[in-house]
Amino acid sequence: METKYHEYDDVQTKDTPSNKYSLNENRGDLIFLIMEIIGESCNSIYDSFTLDAPQFAFRGIDKTLSKDGEIGKLITIIKNLIKEQSYLLKSPMTNNNNNNNNNNNNNNNNNNNNNNNNNNNNNNNNNNNNNNNNNSYNNNNINDNNNSSNNNNNNLEYNTKGGEYISSNQSSPLSIYSTPPNPSSYVSSPLNQPANNTEAFQINGNELDAAQIKIKQLELELQKFKEAGALFAMNKINNSSAPPPPPKACAPPPPPPPPPPITVVKQPSFLMKKGVNNNNNNNNNNNSSNTNDSNNTNNTKPQPTFNFADVLLNRPQLKRVSKDRSPGGTPAKEPKNKSGSVEDALLKAIVSKFKHANSSPVKSHDDSSDSDFE
C-alpha cells in the first residue's frame, strides 16, 4: 500500500538548499526544532534549558545556521503538524486501548504468580496481544515497544493519513517533554538502544521504507533529548539539595609594605644682600666711634639670613693670642725679662734723654712722632 505523505513534505524533497536541514541528516537541526516545539508546550524545561544550561539546548548545533529562512519553514511545518494531530492525541480511544492492554498485562502477571492452572488462558491472552500487534502493523501503524524501559512513553504510532508520528502515552499530549516526578526513571542511558542500525530500522525482520526510517530516527533523537533533559533536572535537584561547599581556608593576605618616607631636601640658601638698608647705614655712620653699641636695636635684631655685609660693618673683635707670632707662622722666642727689670728701666730713660742729641737744632721735631717713645 502506497504511503500518502503530508502536503508539507514537499519542502524536504525539493532540490533546494533546505535539503541540508533534513531531519535524517543533521542532528543539530533536529535538536533545534525540538527546542522550538518545547518552547510552546512545556515552558518549565524550555526556560531551564535556555537560561540555566544552554549547553544542553545547543549541543551539536552549528552556530552558523540562521534562525530564519528554510529553517524557519521547518519549524512552522512541525508546529502545524502537532496542531493538526492534537485531536488524535486527546482521543479517548487510544487511552482506552492502552488501559486495556495494561490491564491485560497486569492480569496475566497476576495469573502466572497466583494460579498455575490458568496457563492456557495466559497463552490465549498473549496470542491475542500478538494478533493485535500484527493487525496494527498491517494497517501501517508502528507500535515500538521498548522492552528495556518500564513506561509507555516510548510508544509511537504511525498515521497513514498524514505520514506523521503521534505519541500513545496516557498523560497530556506533550507530557513526553515534561519533567517526571522522579527524573531517574527517564535516565535509561543511550546504551539501551540497539547497537546495530539495521536492527533499529526493522520490525519483525521487515525493513522500513524511507519515511518510516525518518520517523524512527526522530524517535531515537527524542529519546536522547529526553534523557538529557531528565539528567539535567536530576542534577539540578541534587545541586539545590546539596549543602554549600565550605569556604576555602586561606590566610589573609599580608599587609602591604609601608610607603617610603618622603624626604624633603632643603637647598642651602646663600642669599647675599647687594646693599645694606638705609637704617643700618645711618646707624653705622652716627655710631662710627662705637661699633658694638648695645643700645642699637637694629644690630641686636637677629638676621634671618647670613649676611657678610653686616659682619664687615659690625667688625667683630677677634680673639687675641698671648704668643707673638712671626710672619712664618711659628711662635717667636719669648723675651727673657718678660716682667721687666731695673736695667730695662734705666735703658729706656737714657734713650729718651739722649734721643735728640744728634739732631740738628734747625730741624723741627714733630711732637706727635715723639709720643710713641714717651
Curated annotation (Swiss-Prot):
Pro residues compositional bias, start-end: 242-262
Biased segments, Basic and acidic residues type: 1-13
Ranges of compositional bias, category Low complexity: 95-155, 277-300
Compositionally biased region (Polar residues): 166-193
Region: Disordered, residue numbers: 1-20, 91-193, 236-374
Superkingdom in the source lineage: Eukaryota
Transmembrane segments: none
Descriptive protein name: Uncharacterized protein DDB_G0286379
